[in-house]
Structure formats: C-alpha cells, structure tokens
C-alpha cells in the first residue's frame, strides 16, 4: 500500500516563479501567508488540550521539552530560549533540542534527522521522566528523529504532543496530543521554512505564553518577571512600575534599583498598602 505523501510536499499553487517581478513575488507570498492564522485557529481546541497537560506538570516541578530537526528544531530552541528572559523562569524549565545538536542551529548536519534512536539519547542526557512533557515538531510529520523520540517517551510514561503541518502523519499518530495545522502547498514547493514554519512559530508562541500566564508569570498584561538584561528592558520595567503605582519616573527607577525586579517592587508596594 502506498503511503500518503505529506501535505507539505504538495506542488505549489504558483509556477514560473522566476518570471515574476519582485512585487508579484512579494504579493503572492503574502497572499499565502494570510491563510496561516486561520488554519492555526482551527487547532485551538487541540492546542488547549496540550497546554492543559503542560501547566500542572511544570507547576509540580516538571519540564517542557521540544524536539525537532532543521527549521522545526530551530523554532523549538528559539521558543525555549525566550522563556527565561520573558518570564523569568530557569533555563531548565523549557528545553529545546535539535537533531544534530547546537551545530545544527547554524548549519545543516547531514543525516541527523534520520536516526530514530538519537532523540531519546539526547533526552536522557536531561534525565527526562514522567513528570515532564515532550512536544515533537515536524512540518511533514515524518521526521524519524522526532517520531522515534516521541515513541520512546510515550513508552516511558511521558506525556507527548506534536506540532505538524500535515494531516494523518506518523508523528500525529504516535503522539497523545497532536496539533495538525494543515498549511497546504508552500509557495516554493516543499520549502516548509515558509508557511509551515510560520504556523509552528505561532503555535509555539501560544503554548509557551499561555502556560506561563497560567503559572502566574504575567500580572495583568505585563511581564513582571522578565529579566532586566539590557537598557530597553530596564526602561520597560520602569514604565510598568510608573503605570501600576502611578508614580514619577525617578521614584520608579529608585524602586527598581532597590528591588531588582518589577514583581518585587509591586509586591512590596502591595504589602505596604496592606
């Protein structure tokens, strides 16, 4: 029986791309991009199920792992790396792994994604356990590295989810909580760094942001736990304090310098009022 080809490998709706002028190229790429958010919207119920599994596990000391290869792996590493500065969590709470290791973040590592056993070896270096959650990311849903990792994790009692852009894929079938954002043919046939990659980034944003909000890492709409690692973020923290406490800039600067954290400033002020 012939296996179904991934949706991400379907032939582009456009042809003779090299004959288009620059405006036509940009307009057609943009036209395709307009379809992405609506396709993500269709998967909100599936995203919700996965998020609601992640929250209690991190709250109980567990972690969230992402695994992927190529663009998918890079997006997982990107999302994981943004959680500490944005939400003030330890770098070990959300962990992104890419087939081929950190070298693959900049340069393709030949055949790295074809090893079905390597992901589990990589995960074991972090002592992954049933307290954690593993999310596999693969546009086609056929990447051996990711499928192997998901299957091994599930066999060891670990909650698994996935983000894929092809329906009925082996990865989705292997995962307990599949998210299938079917983005259709790419503008450049098979170039999943385009629509599929954008869709995956949107879903990752939704997962990590909603998890951190539900874990109390946002107050109102503000990143009160963000790391004050540069002048821009210090300025943002000062503005948050000014707005929340209705005070002048000089006083806000003094409080932030004293407490080193927006949350600590706001909590201290709250305790004073009580």
UniProtKB/Swiss-Prot annotation:
Which sites are catalytic? 82 (proton donor), 113
What chemistry does it catalyse, as a reaction equation?
N-acetyl-D-muramate 6-phosphate + H2O = N-acetyl-D-glucosamine 6-phosphate + (R)-lactate
Mention any Pfam family matching this sequence.
Answer: GKRP_SIS_N
* UniProt-listed InterPro entries: Etherase_MurQ, Glucokinase_regulatory_CS, MURQ/GCKR, SIS_dom, SIS_dom_sf
Q: Which GO terms describe its molecular function?
A: carbohydrate derivative binding; carbon-oxygen lyase activity; ether hydrolase activity
Q: Which part of the chain is the SIS domain?
A: 54-217
More details: A lyase-type mechanism (elimination/hydration) is suggested for the cleavage of the lactyl ether bond of MurNAc 6-phosphate, with the formation of an alpha,beta-unsaturated aldehyde intermediate with (E)-stereochemistry, followed by the syn addition of water to give product.
The free-text function statement in the UniProt record for this protein reads:
Specifically catalyzes the cleavage of the D-lactyl ether substituent of MurNAc 6-phosphate, producing GlcNAc 6-phosphate and D-lactate.
Q: Subunit notes for this chain?
A: Homodimer.
Looking up NCBIfam families in the UniProt record yields:
N-acetylmuramic acid 6-phosphate etherase, PRK05441.1, PRK12570.1
Q: Member of which family?
A: Belongs to the GCKR-like family. MurNAc-6-P etherase subfamily.
Q: What is this protein called?
A: N-acetylmuramic acid 6-phosphate etherase
Q: Which gene encodes it?
A: murQ
């Amino acid at each position: 029986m012939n296996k179904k080809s991934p949706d991400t490998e379907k032939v582009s709706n456009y042809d003779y791309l090299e004959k288009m002028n620059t405006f036509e190229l940009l307009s057609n790429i943009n036209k395709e991009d307009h379809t992405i958010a609506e396709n993500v919207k269709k998967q909100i119920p599936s995203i919700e199920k996965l998020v609601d599994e992640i929250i209690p596990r991190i709250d109980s000391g567990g972690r969230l792992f992402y695994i992927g290869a190529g663009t998918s792996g890079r997006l997982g590493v990107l999302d994981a790396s943004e959680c500490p500065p944005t939400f003030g969590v330890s770098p070990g709470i959300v962990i992104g792994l890419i087939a081929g290791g950190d070298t693959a973040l900049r340069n393709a590592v030949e055949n790295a994604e074809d090893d079905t056993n390597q992901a589990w070896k990589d995960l074991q270096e972090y002592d992954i356990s049933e307290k954690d959650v593993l999310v596999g990311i693969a546009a086609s849903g056929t990447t051996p590295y990711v499928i192997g990792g998901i299957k091994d994790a599930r066999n060891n009692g670990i909650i698994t989810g996935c983000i894929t852009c092809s329906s009925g894929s082996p990865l989705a079938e292997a995962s307990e909580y599949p998210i299938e954002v079917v983005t259709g043919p790419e503008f450049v046939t098979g170039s999943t760094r385009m629509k599929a990659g954008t869709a995956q980034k949107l879903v990752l944003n939704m997962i990590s942001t909603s998890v951190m909000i539900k874990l109390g890492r946002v107050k109102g709409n503000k990143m009160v736990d963000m790391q004050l690692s540069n002048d821009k973020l210090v300025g943002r923290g000062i503005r948050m304090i000014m707005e929340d406490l209705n005070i002048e800039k000089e006083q806000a600067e003094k409080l932030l310098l004293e407490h080193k954290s927006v949350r600590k400033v706001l909590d201290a002020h709250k305790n004073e009022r009580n």
